Amino acid sequence: IRCFITPDITSKDCPNGHVCYTKTWCDAFCSIRGKRVDLGCAATCPTVKTGVDIQCCSTDDCDPFPTRKRP
């Protein structure tokens, strides 16, 4: 499987059986810059924590960098 990986946001091969994930959360600059984003691959979908949104998928390049909604 191929997943986008931060910080370069380039598509890279991940080991067999892994999933791609997109993890987003707010930090001190969230209202100005938007949510922080972490893209990668993992053996299993990362555990959801309070204030962190995680989406996992299992097809090539299914985790593109999310677009910020404009007001």
UniProtKB/Swiss-Prot annotation:
Cellular component, GO, one term: extracellular region
Subcellular compartments: Secreted
GO molecular function: acetylcholine receptor inhibitor activity; ion channel regulator activity; toxin activity
One Pfam family per UniProt: Toxin_cobra-type
Keywords: Acetylcholine receptor inhibiting toxin, Disulfide bond, Ion channel impairing toxin, Neurotoxin, Postsynaptic neurotoxin, Secreted, Toxin
Entry keyword tRNA processing: no
InterPro entries: Snake_3FTx, Snake_toxin-like_sf, Snake_toxin_con_site, Toxin_cobra-type
The keyword Secreted is assigned to this record: yes
Disulphides: 3-20, 14-41, 26-30, 45-56, 57-62
Protein family according to the UniProt entry: Belongs to the three-finger toxin family. Long-chain subfamily. Type II alpha-neurotoxin sub-subfamily.
Biological function: Binds with high affinity to muscular (alpha-1/CHRNA1) and neuronal (alpha-7/CHRNA7) nicotinic acetylcholine receptor (nAChR) and inhibits acetylcholine from binding to the receptor, thereby impairing neuromuscular and neuronal transmission.
Protein name: Long neurotoxin 3
